[in-house]
Structure formats: structure tokens, C-alpha cells
């Protein structure tokens, strides 16, 4: 992007977020909408703001996010991961605090696939003795 933007890519489940941050007054825009309009759950808003509150940069940056795939929780986690990486791109000294909070590590949990002969991933068919 043009200007002094810092970039970070975040992933969670099947969601991918591309996050751009620059000095500003604290506006967060997700897919062209204000964050409060995009995420309906209060927990999703809290998850997205966690790295900013931890590093005391809540009103320091304007953040632009493009996120796709997954559901609301996965997208919120992907945005948090992307914001964390963008903050580390902006200032590498923030990494220890973000790492101790667990925001740097990508949450590798994915949906387990359904197996043949099972109802779901692990739910077996009912056993009948006779």
C-alpha cells in the first residue's frame, strides 16, 4: 500500500486476514465496515482489540483489514493474529509482551475430517450386539 503502512497476515481455522496499520486515531475498518458493524458479538470485538490494549496502542493506529473465510470467531482470531504481526512489524520490541500473552503463536487447531463409516469425525455408528 502507499504511505507508511505496516502489514501482518493472520490465520485462524479457515479464516485469513490481511491487516494494514498506520499512525492515526484508532479507527478499525474490516472489509470496508467499522468494526462494531462487522462483528456482532462483544467477545469478537474484545478478541480483536486484545493486542492493542496489551501494548497500549488502542488509539495510536488506524487499522484496515481484509478478512475472508471461516465464521465470526475464526475471523476475529485471524484479525487478532494479523494485528499482532503488524504491531511486531511496526516495533519489534513489542514481541516479548505479545508472545507471553499467546498472541504471536498461530492457533493450529483445525476441524477434524469425517471418517468413512462414522457419523462424524469420531462419533461411531451405534453398536448392536444382536
Swiss-Prot record:
InterPro entries to which the protein is assigned, alphabetical: Ribosomal_Su5_D2-typ_SF, Ribosomal_uS9, Ribosomal_uS9_bac/plastid, Ribosomal_uS9_CS, Ribsml_uS5_D2-typ_fold_subgr
Record GO biological process: translation
One annotated Gene Ontology cellular component of this protein: cytosolic small ribosomal subunit
Keyword Ribonucleoprotein appears in the UniProt entry: yes
Keyword Ribosomal protein found: yes
Source species, domain of life: Bacteria
UniProt keywords, alphabetically: Ribonucleoprotein, Ribosomal protein
Molecular functions per Gene Ontology: RNA binding; structural constituent of ribosome
Assigned protein family: Belongs to the universal ribosomal protein uS9 family.
Identification of the protein by name: Small ribosomal subunit protein uS9
Annotated source species: Paraburkholderia phymatum (strain DSM 17167 / CIP 108236 / LMG 21445 / STM815)
Gene behind the chain: rpsI
Amino acid at each position: 500500500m502507499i504511505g507508511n503502512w505496516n502489514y501482518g497476515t493472520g490465520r485462524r481455522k479457515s479464516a485469513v486476514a490481511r491487516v494494514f496499520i498506520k499512525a492515526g486515531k484508532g479507527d478499525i475498518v474490516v472489509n470496508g465496515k467499522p468494526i462494531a458493524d462487522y462483528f456482532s458479538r462483544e467477545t469478537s470485538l474484545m478478541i480483536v482489540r486484545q493486542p492493542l490494549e496489551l501494548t497500549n496502542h488502542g488509539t495510536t493506529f488506524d487499522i484496515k483489514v481484509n478478512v475472508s473465510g471461516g465464521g465470526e470467531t475464526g475471523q476475529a482470531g485471524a484479525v487478532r493474529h494479523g494485528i499482532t504481526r503488524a504491531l511486531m512489524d511496526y516495533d519489534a520490541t513489542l514481541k516479548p509482551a505479545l508472545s507471553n500473552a499467546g498472541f504471536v503463536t498461530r492457533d493450529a487447531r483445525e476441524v477434524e475430517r469425517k471418517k468413512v463409516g462414522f457419523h462424524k469425525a469420531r462419533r461411531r455408528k451405534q453398536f448392536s450386539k444382536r
